[in-house]
Swiss-Prot record:
GO terms for molecular function: nutrient reservoir activity. InterPro entries: Cupin_1, RmlC-like_jellyroll, RmlC_Cupin_sf, Seed_Storage-Functional. Residues 1-30 form the signal peptide. Gene3D superfamilies: Jelly Rolls (2.60.120.10). It comes from the Eukaryota. This is Conglutin beta 5. Disulfide bonds: none annotated. PANTHER family: OS03G0336100 PROTEIN-RELATED, VICILIN C72. Belongs to the 7S seed storage protein family. Residues 33-221, 384-439, 606-626 are annotated as: Disordered. Keywords: Allergen, Glycoprotein, Seed storage protein, Signal, Storage protein. Seed storage protein. Accumulates during seed development and is hydrolyzed after germination to provide a carbon and nitrogen source for the developing seedling. Residues 606-615 have a biased composition (Low complexity).
């Protein structure tokens, strides 16, 4: 019994060990089957299937899964319980998928299309993401290629510039001392290039009007700029001469001013930072010049001229009842070249008083009174809330009229009471007016008259080195070609119409042999009242009058100027040439040249169309002689 008791526990223990071994073997065998199960590799193959292959339908997938399950059941009949659980789960999944498919079939057609489009967009985005790295690599390669190409080009450009610099240095070394002359020559070439461009612009003008506008020496009356204008008159200033062309740079400090006023009007007192030479071209005037110790008034008529120094206070009256007053002035600015300003002591609606520029304390100390009284008497009230009485007082003082105001008969009589007239004959005074036609003309015949006042004959214009000319050309007459040796003349057309021809020189540069070629250039324009014409020194000129023409001229740099005529019986420089020189320089013989010069028996002025008129008379004479014969023959036949 005791042995049985001992063996029974051992038997139980052995059975337990065997059971444990069997269980462990079964577990191991089950894991081995799980590892060897072909379902998972197939599922991985499904997951790793190439996305480019067309997707299979759900029915095909279910058939494949069912086929795999049948194989597993045949291969492993011992996995009944676990297989039943898995089959139940798969059945539930199939039902869910079947329900989802039924719901999708019940959705509208456009929803399915929308899903398909979304899937297509997702596929395109995925493809774009896959292609993006490749694009970036290509862009980097292109950038690297372009940068290398640009570096190569920049290197070539640097080498090219270096070679050009070396060539330039070699040329400079070879030329040596002539480099200074070449730099001057280059500047002159640039200057002449600008002139050539201007002249080409003039040649391009097809119409006469465009040609007039492109002529640098001609300024129409429309080129005046209005400084002030009201119902009583206007003040105009011509544009600067040097703005048109650099050939007139020596005239940059000279301006032409013109003012016109109605009858019985007064141009208010003022002074300017410019010297003036004024000339009356229409009507009558009374000018009053105010100095610190005295006041002088002069009566001016047509052709009278007067020097008005800079800083001199003056005012001009038009005393005539019918005629307008027209005055032309040559202004010579003092402070700034080409710019001048007028300073008025009184305030108007268009002009402030120079007293308004001072402070209140300065004005009170200057006039030794309160500022209110100074404002009431000199400055006027600028407050819009001034009372009616003050406003009426300002209207009576003509502050609302402007710079040119009307005056009464009584005021005109008082202003002219002590005025002096200009000197018609004898020696001109040092301060009073003088008339341009007071002396005999220097050139005169039946076709015209030429008056001139030179600096050595008049002390008023001597320090300014200015001369004045006044020319009268009859209708159909010609001022013969001539040129001035030193003076530059600014001509103002006072009255009439005509044509002028001015001869200049154009410089051209030949690039091959680097030589300058001078070509003759002709400038011409139609002249009318108010136009301005500039005649440079040394430039031949002729003027043809289509109606009675009157010209006023200001000569700049006029001291010792000489006028040289190119035709006519007197003062003809061509006539004074030696006979041998005439033989050399002209195509014709010396006898032919002298005979040609002697054909013109007039001097300075001549008939503008002598040959045409003579031919016309000859034709009329021949027609008159043939008249009776032709009438008889026509009667006979």
């Amino acid at each position: 019994m005791a042995k049985m008791r001992v063996r029974f526990p051992m038997l139980v223990l052995l059975l337990g060990v065997v059971f444990l071994l069997a269980v462990s073997i079964g577990i191991a065998y089950g894991e081995k089957d799980v590892i060897k199960n072909p379902e998972r590799p197939e599922e991985r193959q499904e997951e790793e299937r190439d996305p480019r292959q067309p997707p299979r339908s759900r029915q095909q997938e279910e058939q494949e899964r069912e086929h795999r399950r049948e194989k597993e059941r045949d291969r492993e009949p011992s996995r009944g319980r676990s297989e039943s659980k898995q089959s139940q789960e798969e059945e539930r999944e199939r039902r869910k998928e079947h329900d989802r498919e039924r719901e999708q079939e019940q959705q509208p057609q456009y929803g399915r299309r929308h899903e398909e489009e979304e899937k297509g967009e997702e596929e395109e985005e995925g493809q774009a993401r896959r292609q993006r790295p490749q694009r970036r690599r290509e862009e980097r390669e292109q950038e690297q290629g372009s940068s290398s190409e640009s570096r190569r080009q920049s290197g070539d450009e640097r080498r090219h510039r270096h070679e050009k610099r070396e060539q330039r240095e070699e040329r400079e070394q070879e030329q040596g001392s002539s480099s200074g002359r070449q730099s001057d020559y280059g500047r002159r070439q640039r200057h002449e290039g600008r002139e050539q461009r201007e002249e080409r612009e003039q040649e391009q003008g097809s119409s006469s009007e465009s040609h007039r506008l492109r002529n640098p020496y001609y300024f129409s009356s429309e080129r005046f700029q209005t400084r002030y204008k009201n119902k009583n008159g206007q003040i105009r200033v011509l544009e600067r001469f040097d703005q048109r062309t650099n050939r007139l740079e020596n005239l940059q400090n000279y301006r032409i001013v013109e003012f016109q006023s109605r009858p019985n009007t007064l141009i208010l007192p003022k002074h300017s930072d410019a010297d003036y030479i004024l000339v009356v071209l229409n009507g009558r005037a009374t000018i009053t010049i105010v100095n610190p110790d005295k006041r002088q008034a002069y009566n001016l008529e047509y052709g009278d001229a007067l020097r008005l120094p800079a800083g001199t206070t003056s005012y001009i009256l038009n005393p005539d009842d019918n005629q307008d007053l027209r005055v032309v002035k040559l202004a010579i600015p003092i402070n700034n070249p080409g710019k001048f300003y007028d300073f008025y002591p009184s305030r108007t609606k268009d002009q402030q008083s120079y007293f308004s520029g001072f402070s209140k304390n300065t004005l009170e100390a200057t006039f030794n009174t309160h500022y209110e009284e100074i404002q009431r008497i000199l400055l006027g009230y600028e407050d819009e809330q001034e009372d009616e009485e003050q406003r009426r007082e300002q209207e009576q003082s003509h502050q609302d009229e402007g710079v040119i105001v009307r005056v009464s008969k009584e005021q005109i009589q008082e202003l002219r009471k002590h005025a002096q007239s200009s000197s018609r004959k004898g020696k001109p005074s040092e301060s009073g007016p003088f008339n341009l036609r007071s002396n005999e003309p220097i050139y005169s015949n039946k076709f015209g008259n030429f008056y001139e006042i030179t600096p050595d004959r008049n002390p008023q214009v001597q320090d300014l080195d200015i001369s004045l000319i006044f020319t009268e050309i009859s209708e159909g007459a010609l001022l013969l070609p001539h040129y001035n040796s030193k003076a530059i003349f600014v001509i103002v057309v006072d009255e009439g119409e005509g044509n002028y021809e001015l001869v200049g020189i154009r410089n051209q540069q030949r690039q091959q042999d680097e030589q300058e070629v001078e070509e003759v250039r002709s400038y011409n324009a139609r002249l009318s009242e108010g136009d301005i014409l500039v005649i440079p020194a040394g430039h031949p000129l002729s003027i043809n009058a289509s109606s009675n023409l009157r010209l006023l001229g200001f000569g700049i740099n006029a001291d010792e100027n000489q006028r040289n005529f190119l035709a006519g019986s007197e003062d003809n420089v061509i006539r004074q040439l030696d006979r041998e020189v005439k033989e050399l320089i002209f195509p014709g013989s010396a006898e032919d040249v002298e005979r040609l010069i002697r054909n013109q028996q007039q001097s300075y002025f001549a008939n503008a169309q002598p040959q045409q008129q003579q031919q016309q008379r000859e034709k009329e004479g021949r027609r008159g002689r043939r008249g009776p014969i032709s009438s008889i023959l026509s009667a006979l036949y």
